[in-house]
Amino acid sequence: EVPESALYGVQTLRGIENFRISKFHLNEYPLFIQALAITKMGAVVANRKLDLLTEEQADAILKACKEVLEGKHHEQFPVDMIQGGAGTTTNMNVNEVIANRALELMGHRRGEYQYCSPNDHVNRSQSTNDAYPTAIHIGLYYTHLKLVKHFGELIASFR
């Protein structure tokens, strides 16, 4: 049973139970969580422009994603980093957290997925094979920017 305090849902809980492989969990990788939120935000904007989401759904999902970007709710990502497949458990964990937070922002209860579904709304027009590698690329880009900055500082210190 999903804990009452959890923003994640039953798919995440099943993933936790099925994949106890390493001691490394998604919540230990904030940059990857943020990159996944950015990926979801991009899909929401595109889906709203195509009228595949209502304005209310899109606004709530975007607000939930922004909260994740600000570092909120990171404890809600307990899945193991090593999983079977291509990261489906990670993708569903993110979808469920964003959907349930969006539901709260819309004035609904967690799990009332007829209003905002992890699959049908947050993950619309995506698959794990889209979202996961896109987030990896986004995370690498931001890591690259930090590395370039630090190399610049190192070079300056030698002058």
What does each model-identified segment do?
Residues 1-159:
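Conserved, well-structured ligand/cofactor-binding cores
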